[in-house]
């Protein structure tokens, strides 16, 4: 997790930190085909998000992710922070939506739909292939290999999570500390690892048991598929959700056994939380910023 953020998290950091809200007059003119309002220098001093906006975006995202985690919902840090940054951008510009990078936001939103579907399809195919191979192999020998493979794939999931979620968590801070990206990545990775160890068990139970039962080969297929999908999007600088990818992959494994083996109600409730999270985070961040700054 820490290594993923430190070595390959910069693309997502740049997108979250500087690619969602337009704070530069030149970028505004190029994006909107018109000169920016004269108040842009008041909205975004020094051509960046104000410090209050950065803090409120982070607090808003952290609040919604914490509440969801406590409620056992695997929501997306990516969605929460993107919503938070967009919200403070709208609040800082006095509700002028032209300061949002609409094209970037649409691309991000599209990736939130594609990512779990891609992971689901990959997991479905990989689990089906593993099933064929296991039927032709000695059970005892393959059991040991699968156990080791699950541990390795779990490490890959953590690495991929770091490449994306660390960038999400600290992306807004590069507005304030553009020369401290390695240190911020290390801090973000350590903080996420600490949160996973101390507060992640509730969500782990939901994903691992309440969607569909997983054996070793199912866990391997789900982990590899989710990690691969997230890693690709991270390299492209698109903030997607590891949670969404993992849930999609677990559903893919379940579908190989038939639709009845997937907890439909739980999947629907999780999907609803994915819609609520960015909207709520954006609304809260926007309102909080206007309240704080008047």
Kindly label every feature range from the protein language model.
Residues 1-294:
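Multi-pass alpha-helical transmembrane bundle typical of ion/small-solute transporters
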